[in-house]
Amino acid sequence: MKTKHLAASILATLGASNAVFADHSWNDYHWARTTSSFDLTIINSTTPDWDGYVSQAISDWSQSNKLNMIEDVNGDTSSRTRRKCNAPDGMVRICNLEYGQNGWLGIAGISLDNQGHIITGYTKMNDSYFNMAYYSGDDWKQSVTCQELGHDIGLGHQDEDFDNESLFSCMDYQDPPYEYPNRHDYDQLGIMYGHTDSYNSYSNDGGDGGDGGGNGCNAPPGKGCNKGESNSGQSIGWGRSVYKRGNAEVFMRIDPDGTRHLTHVTWAIGHENDHGGHDGHQH
């Protein structure tokens, strides 16, 4: 099987860093396809209370003329599946669960083949926060669902400063949140998918995709289930810190088979310094 590189982006409960970017692709990550548009299967493994938000986000992203998200409404909703949230190669799985009060509302992760194309993705929605009164509204749930699925197709954030003026996009950090993509999001997808490739990564056969960080472990480095040695390829969870700037931090874990896992974290205010294992550098 091809070596996979897994990257994850985490939306925190509150956090701030970086400014507005005109180009908000996520490091040019995209799904390989041989046609100008493609159908991407989203396996819905959320509980019924999330179905409406997932269906709405899938419909919104399908307004792009470059991709059409197809909802698989028969996704397994067992707690085991939702904790790991693995997706088959060529597809995306979205899950919800009480993952713990660890500072994030949602995670989006992608796995890359050896040519740098996305071959699988996943999204986790953290009910430990969405069950709280502050985050229980439709606006937060819809916005985070929209944003994390946007990451799964290769989009980054338009802005990561909660205090900036709203850009009216779910790919913008803002409070109160905005629930839908905007024209710039669709234009960015048009640029990212404005070419064709020599093969289709969305139709690959294979086993499970990324597991959302550490085989279900969602604890910060040095805490709880994530007590592996930070510089070891055997470490579990997020691994070692390789970058930190304000409330933003990036962790890397390397598996014995060479698979690399990158996790981008935007810490909640008050959480940026209460985790262990930082051995990276600040900018």
Which residue ranges define each predicted feature?
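Metzincin-family zinc-dependent endopeptidase catalytic domain
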Residues: 51-164, 236, 242, 254
